[in-house]
Amino acid sequence: MFLLLRFLLPLLFLTQLVCADEMSSNKAKSIQAIKELGSSLKSSVQMAMKESGSIGALEYCNVVALDITKKLSESLKLTVSRTSLKTRNKKNIPDDWEQKSLSVFTAQHIAGEEIKNMYFHEIVTTNNNDRIYRFIKPIPMGKVCLTCHGSNISADLAHKIKELYPDDKAV
């Protein structure tokens, strides 16, 4: 179960004001945003890993990951973020809707469904009676991610993780 939860890191959700008949259009936009964010984060971390090693990449990710996500949100005019049942950064703690969705993904994965086929989306009504479109999809972790999120982390890297993320639950 612990390995499964690590495999589901990170996850994304998007919100945008919509009408019910715009579901497929918003789904396509959401999937594209996820691809862009995943690609951008992966290439940035790989570059930092090559230039500065795992500790340098962790420090880079600590500073840049939220900025990359914010810039993508602004450029696409969507709210894009990452979350997980086991967050590293407390700014990424899931809300109730996300937590429920993540729990469903975990159960689906245990039942044998492939992560690449999982997603959930719906239009929800907020406390302000606004209707928003929400989309969440797990992103399987690649090899580079396991350097900091895997089970075989060096003592130096573990110390740096604890220093940068004192409330870390992602390891």
What are these regions (language model features)?
Residues 11-19:
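Hydrophobic h-region of N-terminal signal peptides that target proteins for export
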Residues 142-152:
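The canonical Cys-X-X-Cys-His
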Residues 2-11:
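Sec-dependent signal peptide recognition
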Residues 20-141, 156-171:
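Extracytoplasmic c-type cytochrome modules immediately beyond a signal peptide or single-pass transmembrane anchor
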